[in-house]
């Protein structure tokens, strides 16, 4: 390339750089405008929420003294207030907010709000794929430890993988909740309890008690991975249909249990889920029995027994509540 051409190239680059500087200046201005709008929206929402709470309290005071027409008006306003709170939830999904205590401990005070619907859905989709791939890896790991590699070292690798998997799930779920995902209740707590359980399993030293429970735990892990794979396969298809019909949010997640939206098309999974819940109870009873063994000296045995019992109670009662609520609704619909 001649010197003249190099000079021409440099001239073009200078023009492009100046244009880039102008574009970047506009970009920074828009960011400042966006930040101001976000603060303004958050302020309006908080103010509106406070006023709605006060209004709801005042209306509640009139319920017992109002006539029939006034009661209907109060009920109508109550229903609108609930709808308004749902609208606020959707709005806040696109606004920066304070992280939960857990996210603050893990990530610090970092803004995890994803601003576009496409970015949110891409993150949710990546979360679902992560669950699927790790479920398959954990299934293969449990089968290998149960039938091929009978070593404590390989068991520790498997248990460490479980700890990492559940820790990562809790972080990703917390980010999704901050971005408008409606996963809540026991199915959030479930992964924290599972993280603790896997951590205790990892610290359990090799010995007679460990070997007496090892095969049962690995068999349970194989079963659990198979159930999770089935749930992902059928729940993702069901959610796709419900989202297409507008009956579910685009950030709705697959879960390890049973929820009301699964009633149509996924009830065949209920017996499998209940079997898994009672297997957790069986694990708890086995460990309680081992804790009374004369050679049992490890604290992990009793702690694991309590943790499995907690998982059973949480899973079983939550699933039972969903089934009971659905039956009650079906009874009310019947003439």
UniProtKB/Swiss-Prot annotation:
Give the way it sits in the membrane: Multi-pass membrane protein
Task: Write out the annotated subcellular location.
Answer: Nucleus inner membrane
- Keyword Transmembrane helix attributed: yes
Identify the InterPro entries for this entry: TMEM120A/B (IPR012926)
Gene Ontology BP terms? fat cell differentiation
| Coiled-coil regions listed in the entry | 1-39
Please tell me whether the keyword Transmembrane is annotated for this protein. yes
GO CC terms, sorted: nuclear inner membrane
Residue ranges crossing the lipid bilayer per the database entry:
100-116, 130-150, 157-177, 193-213, 268-288, 300-320
Keyword terms: Coiled coil, Membrane, Nucleus, Transmembrane, Transmembrane helix
Q: Please classify the protein's predominant subcellular localization into one broad category.
A: nucleus
Role of this protein: Necessary for efficient adipogenesis. Does not show ion channel activity.
The similarity comment for this entry is:
Belongs to the TMEM120 family.
The protein here is known as Transmembrane protein 120B-B
Q: Which organism is it from?
A: Xenopus laevis
Taxonomic lineage of the native organism:
Eukaryota, Metazoa, Chordata, Craniata, Vertebrata
């Amino acid at each position: 390339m001649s010197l003249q051409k190099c000079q021409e190239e440099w001239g073009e680059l200078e023009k492009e750089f100046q244009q880039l500087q102008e574009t970047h200046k506009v970009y920074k201005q828009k960011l400042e405008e966006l930040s101001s709008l976000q603060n303004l929206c958050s302020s309006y929402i908080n103010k509106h929420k406070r006023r709605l709470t006060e209004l709801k309290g005042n209306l509640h005071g009139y319920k017992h003294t109002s006539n029939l027409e006034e009661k209907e008006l109060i009920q109508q306003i109550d229903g609108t207030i609930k709808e308004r709170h749902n609208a606020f939830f959707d709005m806040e999904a696109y606004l920066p907010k304070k992280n939960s205590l857990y996210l603050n401990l893990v990530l610090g005070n970092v803004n995890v709000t994803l601003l576009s619907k496409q970015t949110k859905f891409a993150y949710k989709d990546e979360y679902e794929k992560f669950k699927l791939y790790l479920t398959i890896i954990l299934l293969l790991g449990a089968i290998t430890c149960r039938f091929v590699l009978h070593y404590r070292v390989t068991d520790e690798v498997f248990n460490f993988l479980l700890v990492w998997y559940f820790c990562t799930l809790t972080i990703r779920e917390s980010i999704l909740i901050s971005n408008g995902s409606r996963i809540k209740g026991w199915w959030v707590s479930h992964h924290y309890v599972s993280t603790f359980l896997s951590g205790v399993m990892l610290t359990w030293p090799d010995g007679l008690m460990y070997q007496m429970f090892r095969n049962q735990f690995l068999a349970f892990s194989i079963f659990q991975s198979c159930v999770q794979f089935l749930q992902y396969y059928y729940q993702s298809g069901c959610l796709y249909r419900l989202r297409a019909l507008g009956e579910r949010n685009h950030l709705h997640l697959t879960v390890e249990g049973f929820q009301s939206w699964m009633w149509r098309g996924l009830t065949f999974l209920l017996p499998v889920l209940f079997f898994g819940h009672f297997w957790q109870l069986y694990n708890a009873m086995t460990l309680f029995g081992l804790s009374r063994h004369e050679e049992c000296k490890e604290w992990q045995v009793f702690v694991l027994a309590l943790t499995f019992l907690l998982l059973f109670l949480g899973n079983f009662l939550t699933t039972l509540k969903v089934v009971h609520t659905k039956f009650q609704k079906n009874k009310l619909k019947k003439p």
